Amino acid sequence: MRAAILREYNKDLSIETVSDPECPEDGVILKVLACGVCRPDWHGWVGEHPRIKPGQIGGHEYCGEVIEAGPRATYKKGDRLVAPFILSCGSCPTCQSGAGHTCPNQRLPGFTEPGAFAEYVAVPFDHNLARLPETLSPTVAAGLGCR
C-alpha cells in the first residue's frame, strides 16, 4: 500500500510503498476513505510532539470501509466506520469504570502505531468504532473521531 511517512521534521512527507497492515484478532482493516489533518499532526511534523518520530505514518482522525475483520471483531466487510483518536482496550479496570480515555493500554494511531495517512489502517479494539450512516460523507465523518 502507499503511505505518507514522516522522514524528517519540517520536510514534505514521503509517499512510499509499505507492507499492508495485519488484521488484529479483535479489530479490522479499514480502507481509508478520508483522513483529516489536525494540529497534533503539525506538531509532529515540526518535531514538537514527543510521540511522533521520523518513520511514523500519521493520521488520527479518519473513517473507512472494512476490508477485513478479525475473528473476534464485531464488524464485517463493507461496514463504513469512524474511529476515535484514543482506542481503549475495553477490558482493564480503568475502561470498566467508564474512563476509557485514560486507558493504560490505549493505542493511538498516528502516534503510537501507524495511522491513516495511508491506503489502509489496522484498528484494534473494534468496540471503539462507530458505524457511519450512508447519508454522511467520509470527508465530514473523518474529523468526528478527533478528541
Question: Predicted segment positions?
Answer:
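Extracellular beta-rich ligand/substrate-recognition surface
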Residues: I5-D12
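Glycine-rich beta-strand-centered segment in the early N-terminal region that forms part
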Residues: P21-C35, E48-P93, P133-T135
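Cytochrome P450 core scaffold surrounding the K-helix E-X-X-R motif
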Residues: P40-W45
